[in-house]
């Protein structure tokens, strides 16, 4: 059995994908799997899946075609087994606006959205790309002028109320919530790209020191999101806890697996090591 770890790609999250892919590949090889890495770029986004010999495609791709369902569609056409969510779940959850609409339709509370800028009822607001991850292109705007400038910088912006509260994230593995982690940024008000991936950018408190009721509710909602969207393998849902109310922000169908990523920390709450998560993922998608 051969496992090809696909990483890289052409999205703005390429560097994180490479780091995640290297960590996963190292774990697989350490555990005795016949695994090798394949780095994707603009020239081989389809051919790499056709030309390589593998029984399982371990996808460690963040953003762009690696997370929006397109590569999953290629693998479906080829009849290849691959890790993670399928075409539909990947495509929908990559679009933050559609994700919010569906979440709201099943009774999950989210921050209020505006479009266009003229509709904003109060400031500050958060403006972010509708289809980027890793908090890329995230703006905190305190007035209309700042909002208009932020919107100009983004191809497809989404505008939301900025809710002050505790930033939480919940990992789900094969439908079961791993636990709740609180993110405490050390430098910036926002949990942006640098806070996520720079050493010392943030502190991860796990399990999150919040009321038991909120902890259980976050776990329940994350599992519901995983199920409602038809997600498979690993997902990670982000929330803001403000005055006892949980607000769902977004769900990630292909969360980072670097040494500073959130899923490895969350996995320890269930007694899983990084290697355990990788092994469970392989076993799940080879069935």
From Swiss-Prot:
Pathway: Cell wall biogenesis; peptidoglycan biosynthesis. Its main location: cytoplasm. Mg(2+) 2 binds at residues 250, 252. It catalyses: 2 D-alanine + ATP = D-alanyl-D-alanine + ADP + phosphate + H(+). ATP binds at residues 124-169. Gene3D superfamilies: 3.40.50.20, ATP-grasp fold, A domain, ATP-grasp fold, B domain. GO terms for molecular function: ATP binding; D-alanine-D-alanine ligase activity; metal ion binding. Its cofactor is Mg(2+); Mn(2+). Residues 98-283 form the ATP-grasp domain. One of its GO terms (biological process) is peptidoglycan biosynthetic process. InterPro entries: ATP-grasp, ATP_grasp_subdomain_1, D-Ala_lig_Van_CS, D_ala_D_ala, Dala_Dala_lig_C, Dala_Dala_lig_N, PreATP-grasp_dom_sf. It comes from the Bacteria. Disulfide bonds: none annotated. Binds 2 magnesium or manganese ions per subunit. Keywords: ATP-binding, Cell shape, Cell wall biogenesis/degradation, Cytoplasm, Ligase, Magnesium, Manganese, Metal-binding, Nucleotide-binding, Peptidoglycan synthesis. Mg(2+) 1 binds at residues 238, 250. PROSITE patterns: ATP_GRASP, DALA_DALA_LIGASE_1, DALA_DALA_LIGASE_2. It is found in: Cytoplasm. Cell wall formation. NCBIfam families: D_ala_D_alaTIGR (TIGR01205), PRK01372.1 (NF002378). Belongs to the D-alanine--D-alanine ligase family. This is D-alanine--D-alanine ligase. It comes from Fusobacterium nucleatum subsp. nucleatum (strain ATCC 25586 / DSM 15643 / BCRC 10681 / CIP 101130 / JCM 8532 / KCTC 2640 / LMG 13131 / VPI 4355). The gene is ddl.
